Amino acid sequence: MAEQIIRVSQIGYLPEAKKFAILMTGDSGRWEYTRYDFSDLKEEGWHQLKIGEAVSDSFLISKHVYDGLADFPLNYMRQQRCGWNPFTGDSCHQKDGYIIYHPTKTGQHIDVRGGWHDASDCLQYATTTGNAIYQMMLAYEQYPELFGDMYQTNGTPGANGIPDIVDEIRWGLDWLDRMNPAPGEFYNQLADDRDHIGMRFPKDDQADYGWGVNNGRPVYFVTGEPQVQGKGMNISTGTSSIVGKYASCFALGSKILAPYYPELAERIGEKAKDAYDLGVRKPGFSQTASVRSPY
């Protein structure tokens, strides 16, 4: 007998909204999809759908189904935190990192703990971090009333008088601040694809970049020129693509953090113009660097 699965909205539905479910029927390695319209169901409360022998997960119909939803993605951001994870209650990557590609500081240690692990590996990029920060800042700037306060700055449960999205913005900006330790000194990337050695928790990282297992990762200095550690060069042509993200995040971040974290707000506000000026002096794009498999 073919397997049947019903997919419904995990969030739920407004009473007067259109409502659809997808019936997935699988047989011999092939899936067929059928869409069902149940918009006539408007009764508030928890429901399930039954189609043939298949039964859906429970879903909610309510006028308040979207209440608090703006805070939900922050669970993912907290889960991705590097340095200390509030979900697991443990630390990781406490010895990051060691500078590479800097004309005078290569091999020196720099404290760049924090930020978020990127995707499903442990790599960290200033460009994706900047994108994540700016999207959160833009959402908060336009709709501050939608965000609650249920977590501490470190991501553990408990209100602290600061909107949770501001705490998460601060977590990201603190890392970008560390990745820009001095005027004209910007870093683009922490770790590289030597990380891709199998699934494990960040605290159990077995990657060795030359300083011993889980004993610090490389931090790539922004040169605006091609870089590589392995098979092929990237094609970086300048700095503006990355330092522009620093500039925009620092400028808007300074404004958003000022009521809550004035010291960090002032520091990054002063750094914003330096980032902008470097982009003007050396226009072009900065790509990330890979070692094992150029991408």
Model-derived regions: residue spans:
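Surface-exposed beta-strand edges and their flanking turn/coil or helix-capping segments
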Residues: 20-23, 50-51, 71-76, 201-203
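Extended ligand-binding groove/face enriched in aromatic
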Residues: 78-128, 155-249, 260, 266-277, ...
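Well-ordered alpha-helical scaffold segments within catalytic/enzyme domains
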Residues: 21, 51, 122, 133-155, ...
